[in-house]
């Protein structure tokens, strides 16, 4: 005969969100109590590069909700959503773009002064 399973929560169907594991206890002959399994935690990926961020703990979203803000992110620009290397690269790229804009402006001014003479 098939073993009867007893769910502890309201959801009584074998779905992906209702994963359980059997718990054998003495005296439980006709039914087996089940323990609910927690969800697998995934590390937080960066939005540019699929790599793990230098962020706080790697845990379930329910646990993250209970943590304070200081434990969920790193105290720097883009802390918690980008790693330090990507932030450095972003700052360098922005600086070089601004430098290029200035160079173009200076070259235009020189060309106009040459035309005027």
From Swiss-Prot:
Polar residues biased stretches: 16-28
Q: Name one GO biological process term.
A: translation
Covalent cross-link Glycyl lysine isopeptide (Lys-Gly) (interchain with G-Cter in SUMO2), where: 108
Would the keyword Phosphoprotein be found if you checked this record's keyword annotation? yes
Q: Which InterPro entries match?
A: Ribosomal_eL34 (IPR008195), Ribosomal_eL34_C_sf (IPR038562)
**Where are the residues of the annotated region Disordered?**
16-35
In its UniProt record, a GO molecular function of this protein is: structural constituent of ribosome
One GO location term (cellular component): ribosome
Phosphoserine sites (modified residues): 12
Q: Which Gene3D superfamilies match?
A: 6.20.340.10, 6.20.370.70
**Subcellular localization, per the record?**
Cytoplasm, Cytosol; Cytoplasm; Endoplasmic reticulum
Q: Which keywords accompany this UniProt record?
A: Cytoplasm, Endoplasmic reticulum, Isopeptide bond, Phosphoprotein, Ribonucleoprotein, Ribosomal protein, Ubl conjugation
* Pfam family for this entry, one: Ribosomal_L34e
Its job:
Component of the large ribosomal subunit. The ribosome is a large ribonucleoprotein complex responsible for the synthesis of proteins in the cell.
Q: How would you summarize the oligomeric state and partners of this protein?
A: Component of the large ribosomal subunit.
Q: Which family does it belong to?
A: Belongs to the eukaryotic ribosomal protein eL34 family.
Name-wise, this protein is: Large ribosomal subunit protein eL34
Q: Which organism is it from?
A: Vicugna pacos
